[in-house]
Amino acid sequence: MKDDFIMFPKVDFAFKEIMRNETVRKGFLSAVLRIKDTDIKSVVILNTNLPKVHSDEKQGILDVRLTMNDNTEIDIEMQVCSMKTWAERSVFYVSKMISEQTHINKMYSNMKKCINISILNFNFTDKTKRFNTTYHICEDTEHFKYTDIAEWHVVELPKLPEVSDGTDIYDWAKFIKSEKREDFEMLAKKNNYLKEAYNQLDIISQDEQKRLEYTARQKALYDYNELMHENYTSGYEKGVAEGKAEGISEGVLKEKTRLAKELLKMKSMTLESIAKCTGLSVEELNALTLA
């Protein structure tokens, strides 16, 4: 019997399962890249097997690698855990996608365009309030493209406004961010691509084996977030404690120095007596007399 359980698309396991559907891939890319769906002739998924062990699994990264129209390679990454070096990481992977082509194509003119699409469940930049941004390699002054070989698209889910801006990418971001079946049903009425995405999500949500894998993945991401939070909290508390101790130590030293200076001015006590009284060494007292 069908229950009301529904997976969250922002959990990368669920997102990747949805992307196995070619119709969904076509609709998603049309929205993100802002191109006509009729211009997308084919979208072939390259890494068809979801890895059991992934080099970035602890950081919550699973990607979908595609080739579009046989002339463009696309890497879609869903990142649920905050990462300060995301820009550098995405540049590295696009560079890797480009360099991998040299093993096949010896002519630079034959290299495919490489695109990274990052769907982030954290704020990537504070330089703009827009939830969707696009980046190229451009000339500094007039901003024309140096090359069209590389391109980056970033979708920041936390920045998604409540009111739609009327774009297809807004509807897709809303779909990925949603957690309630009624929200998915509403979005499915927007267009056939989102309808297909919801149908696919519903199918995998009722698959017992996929549900087990989804739950395991969700737990792994939760555990990672908890570990990062604990490390941050313990590090912060340790820093505060060390700061307090250092502050107290500096305060005591300043008071000893002040007292020593007063006693030295009086010239009624020997250096040895002042040293015993203040806890400073004779050498330190001599330094004060020369200061």
Name the predicted role of every residue range.
Residues M1-R211:
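Conserved single-residue anchors adjacent to enzymatic active/cofactor-binding motifs
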